[in-house]
Curated annotation (Swiss-Prot):
EC number(s) recorded for this UniProt protein: 1.8.5.-
Catalysed reaction, written as an equation: L-methionyl-[protein] + a quinone + H2O = L-methionyl-(S)-S-oxide-[protein] + a quinol; L-methionyl-[protein] + a quinone + H2O = L-methionyl-(R)-S-oxide-[protein] + a quinol
Localization, UniProt: Periplasm
GO cellular component terms given for this protein: periplasmic space
Compositional bias of kind Low complexity: 1-22
Species, as recorded: Yersinia pseudotuberculosis serotype I (strain IP32953)
Keyword Signal part of the UniProt annotation: yes
Protein name: Protein-methionine-sulfoxide reductase catalytic subunit MsrP
Keywords recorded for this protein, A-Z: Metal-binding, Molybdenum, Oxidoreductase, Periplasm, Signal
Residues annotated for Mo-molybdopterin binding in this entry: 120, 123-124, 178, 213, 265, 270, 281-283
Predominant location: periplasm
Subunit description: Heterodimer of a catalytic subunit (MsrP) and a heme-binding subunit (MsrQ).
Xref: Pfam families: Oxidored_molyb
Parts forming coiled coils: none
């Protein structure tokens, strides 16, 4: 396990890229005009380097041009045929004891559980949305520990059993907005990140919080094979400003739909920051470090012109290759049952978090 944050990512390597995502105090004069939504292709919603790496894998297997015209899900099925042995099935989640929160959108219609657990981005287990559910059974979550260090008074290493007993668990129904312009509504179970950080007592030098995912190539095929993992450098890392991390909305998740997290959703511990794009909500966390300097983040290092440090949901600031004005709602229907809705500033949490970004230029700090 590499408990370090001093690595670099792939593609364009830029230091101290302080691009911040969408901010809260945007006025009408500061807003960007909305583009007319257009139909997205797979190339639109997948980073270009990853899109073409996927094609190289298929071509290396001798797959024809006709096959390349198939949807990504069909290509994934074809690749699975070449694999031979199926990965082990993920264990069923264990029921959790928790208190439903009345303060966090109990009126929202939930995304079906099979979609929440079967439609994921977790490139450590493959590029297609069904890959994590199919391949994450190899993840071993027994004896999991989380290290907290850096600019803290009390550095510590905690195990999951302690965390589950240390904080009362609550269920919060949060909106989830992916940077790829799709969305869900999910009943997460967990506790506030700020409560965890207070255990370690951040010092006055601490300004940022850095997070790191497990690094285990023997369990995560995308870490072992760059084609499977989209060409990213691993382990996956993310970061928040300390005031963001201490905000009550920042949530450490241990369960979903009444049970412990399945591996494909980031077991046993993940972050959820509902006002930011989904890639900020790092999965399978093993290391949290408080730091004075802004930490590197995986997608910003991979494509700094496309993915900023802040990653706040903002319908007025488009991705370079697609509009963020609307989003596709993942529901119970199939491919022909497509519903789109307007994207809300800060994913609908502007009243709670806009003050964090007062005076910040949303176009530069995306």
């Amino acid at each position: 396990m590499h408990n370090t944050f001093t690595h670099t990512k792939n593609n364009t390597h830029t230091k101290n890229n302080t691009q911040a995502k969408n901010s809260g105090s945007q006025t009408k004069s500061n807003a960007v005009s909305l583009n007319k939504p257009r139909k997205l292709t797979e190339a639109d919603v997948t980073p270009e380097s990853i899109f073409y790496q996927r094609r190289k894998v298929l071509q290396a297997l001798g797959i024809t041009a006709a096959t390349l015209a198939l949807p990504a899900s069909a290509q994934a099925d074809l690749l699975a045929w070449f694999k031979g042995n199926e990965p082990p099935k993920a264990p069923s989640g264990k029921p959790l004891t928790f208190t439903p929160s009345a303060a966090y959108h109990p009126d929202l219609a939930l995304t079906p559980e099979d979609k929440v657990t079967g439609y994921n981005n977790f490139y450590e287990f493959g590029l297609d949305k069904a890959d994590p559910a199919a391949n994450a059974g190899t993840l071993k979550t027994e004896d999991w520990q989380i290290k907290i260090d850096g600019d803290v008074v009390k550095p510590m290493t905690l195990d999951m059993d302690y965390l589950m007993k240390c904080f009362p668990l609550e269920e919060r129904i949060y909106r989830l907005r992916c940077v790829e312009a799709w969305s869900m509504v999910v009943p997460w179970i967990g506790f506030e990140l700020g409560k965890l950080l207070k255990l370690a007592e951040p010092t006055s030098n601490a300004r940022y919080v850095a997070f790191q995912t497990l690094y285990a190539p023997d369990q995560m095929p995308g870490q072992k094979n760059r084609f499977i993992g989209g060409g990213l450098d691993y382990p996956y890392v993310e970061g928040l400003r300390l005031d963001e991390a201490m905000h009550p909305l920042a949530f450490m998740v241990v369960g979903v739909y009444g049970k412990t997290l399945p591996p494909q959703n980031g077991a046993p511990l993940r972050l959820m920051t509902p006002w930011k794009y989904g890639f900020k909500s790092i999965k399978s966390i093993v290391h949290i470090r408080l730091t004075r300097d802004q930490p590197p983040t995986t997608w910003n290092l991979s494509a700094p012109n496309e993915y900023g440090f802040y990653a706040n949901v903002n319908p007025h600031v488009d991705h370079p290759r697609w509009s963020q004005a609307t989003e596709r709602v993942i529901g119970s229907g199939g491919i022909l049952d497509v519903k789109r809705q307007p994207t809300l500033l800060f994913n609908g949490y502007a009243d709670q978090v806009a003050s964090l970004y007062r005076g910040l230029d949303l176009r530069k700090n995306f």
